[in-house]
Amino acid sequence: MKPIKILLAACLLLAWQVGPAQADAEAGPVQEAAPALGNDISWPQCGSDLPAPPAFAVVGVNGGRPDTVNPCLAAQLAWADQTSDAAGGTPAAVYVNTAATGPVDSLWWPAANTYRGMDIINPYGGCDGSETPACAYVHGYAMAFNDVEILKGSGDAAVRRVWWLDVETGNSWLWDKAVNAAELEGMTAYLTSTGVEVGIYSTEYQFGEIVGEVGPGSNLYRLRNWLAGAESTSSAREYCTASPLTSGGTVALTQFTEGDLDYNYRCPRAPVTAQHPDPQPAPQPEKARSRAYAELHAAQIS
């Protein structure tokens, strides 16, 4: 009897260990709630009917170029601050246009490590007015300062929003990628000094053409990424697993366009395992767009 009792006890122990796992396996994986989509808007949507506030939003500060103003900024921020995220205490994000022009007659370019009375600590040394990383760093720092002033001028009190740097070939850039990188580093330095989080919006191709490889010593290296180029909710989801713009970065948002609106998919912080129905954008009325709008839209976030 003793061997039988031992065998019976062993079988009961095995059943106790296997039972719950087997039940879980039969039940299948736990389904995650489908993530909601967000929108980004800016000056091209001025005068247009906006959709109901989405889960989250990103609003453009500029009018398509650095150091310009989105004329509808205040109204669009008011719309964006009705999103689900804003209701939960997270204000809508903003994005700013970026460019490195170099010393040209029609645009301001620095000649020293100062701007509006501020002494700028420059990792590239002294700016002498030339087309160098040192001067690009000061220029970027100054553009970011102006962007913050634009946001404050719109009556916005939530300065500590997430700020995205819009890096696209549609704006002016120099042939030297190191100079272009310094421009973005200067912007990042000023914005992070105000206590905000900064990220980069671009595509792999455009970022490679403008900036190229970024090393661990750059303040761009670990920034979160917002990747453009997806064509649908499904491909936006797939873009979450794409390579980041920098080796130390992470893909946080992906973007696709439908109708006259850009839609954004928020990537999960962990790898996607459970499959669930993808959220779909609400139908939008078709509107005729001019050739000029189409050309600008291809070069800028709308």
Language model regions located:
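Glycine-rich, charge-decorated loop segments at or immediately adjacent to ligand/cofactor-binding or catalytic sites
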Residues: G102-W109, Q206-G217
